[in-house]
Amino acid sequence: VIPVVYATSQLYSQKQFQKLNYPYTLDTLYNNAVVEKGSSTYQSQFKVLNLGLDDSYTIHQKKKTNKTYKLLQSLKNKILVLEFDVQNKKPKQAVSITINGIKNKLSKITSPYYNQNTHFTYLISNIKNDELIVSFSKGNYKLKNLKAYTLDDSIIKDREKEVDSLSLETGKDLINGTIDVSNSGYLITHLPYDQGYQIQIDEKNVKSEIVNTAFLGCKISKGKHRISIQFKPKGYHSGFVLSYLGMMIVVFNYIYERKKKNEE
């Protein structure tokens, strides 16, 4: 598992990343930090898998049905990605398909929060007996553009050893700790980027950036550092000043009224 905060010098270009299709984005993102200016030449390790399936299937049933499919080859120590499009022929009825415990759902079109989820994706690991257990909801719908990919799970397991993790400490800040950076690169967090965050390295404010397409990060140099991350919502300072001024006006008014009464 990748740490909550870590440093890495494996930097992948944001521009290049945007050219990748799913699922090739998955391991590329996991094994690199995606930043504005990156030079990593990483190539996705996902491989197309032939499941021996037709390109499309029509499901027409009056009740929920469970089916088991035996895979043509062993997927031991592999991660399986499945994806396909769903065409709901009865849009006033929801469609859900669960594969090995992972559920995707297309809500009915009359739902107050219609999700428009017509593309189902599944990321499946630890497949037992090389079987896929599939649960189809009742309804009339078509599955098309079925695609499958595999990835050796070692590519995921080894990543944790390749990054420098932050040793977290307790403190008043949102995140506080020390880190020993092997090579200059980027500090990466799992915090969604927001202008209210302030990162300090060795008690000095640094410029934060959007990394990994949507998260908070910043540049960091090689060596041992102390890291602290604080969060102050936008407008916090001006709001604090206005509140303080408002309080002072109330206090001064109170003092003035008391003085006026004493003089009377």
PLM ranges: what are they?
Residues 1-264:
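Active-site-proximal, structured, solvent-exposed surfaces of multi-pass membrane proteins
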